[in-house]
Regions:
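ABC ATPase NBD coupling module
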Residues: 6-20
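A structural signal for short, well-ordered beta-strand elements
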Residues: 8, 46, 157-158
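Short adenine-binding "F-helix/F-box" segment of the Bergerat
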Residues: 12, 46, 167
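ABC-family ATPase nucleotide-binding domain "signature/switch" substructure
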Residues: 16-25, 33-36, 52-58, 68-168, ...
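ABC-type ATPase nucleotide-binding domains, specifically the catalytic core motifs of the NBD
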Residues: 38-46
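ABC ATPase nucleotide-binding domains
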Residues: 176-184
Length: 184
């Protein structure tokens, strides 16, 4: 039993190091920006965090904070906007370089400016790795290799963005509505 627990623990540790999740509601500690990104991992340097922030497009907003990367943020990131909290979560995922990335509604409640930064960050972060992106905003998933459209837990369509538009089904209807809303 002890050996099984040890093996399971080792496997879980490896698994956890290879998966990063960016949720709709980002959890942040009442700590510095740096510590919220590294989660206290001493193997991640400030230089790595700064480089990741530049890649994600968040370096400018962090540099504008009073103590920059050492700025202490309030409980749950209360002193930051929703978009800024999302960007910190993207930097966190970026510095860990996971094999599997899961994005759950990462752009659902952010302003337009933050959404553009997050879309660029998504492109950089998903490049070269397996990614599962859960999104209602189709702009987030347009470049995906494969899009799965679900309704009430059932797959109803799948394909690339272009294939799904050509299909003329549910995805096309969603796309048309979102495009129309952007134009209005």
């Amino acid at each position: 039993l002890v050996k099984t627990s040890l093996v399971l623990t080792q496997h879980l540790t490896t698994l956890r190091k290879n998966i990063a999740i960016v949720l709709q509601d980002v959890f942040l500690f009442s700590d510095t920006v740096f510590n919220n990104i590294t989660l206290g991992d001493p193997s991640i340097s400030l230089a790595q965090v700064i480089q990741a922030a530049k890649e994600v497009g968040a370096h400018d907003f962090i540099s504008a904070l009073p103590d920059q990367y050492h700025h202490k943020i309030g409980e749950r990131g209360g002193t930051l906007s929703t978009g800024q909290r999302q960007l910190l979560a993207f930097i966190r995922a970026y510095v860990y370089q996971p094999a599997l990335l899961i994005l759950d509604e990462a752009t659902s409640s952010v302003d337009t400016e933050s959404e553009l930064l997050i879309q660029r960050a998504t492109e950089k972060l998903t490049a070269g790795r397996t990614s599962i992106v859960i999104a209602h905003r189709l702009s987030t998933i347009r470049k995906a290799d494969r899009i799965i459209v679900m309704e009430k837990g059932t797959i109803i369509e799948q394909g690339t963005h272009e294939e799904l538009l050509a299909l003329g089904g549910h995805y096309k209807n969603l796309s048309d509505r979102q495009y129309f809303n952007q134009e209005a």
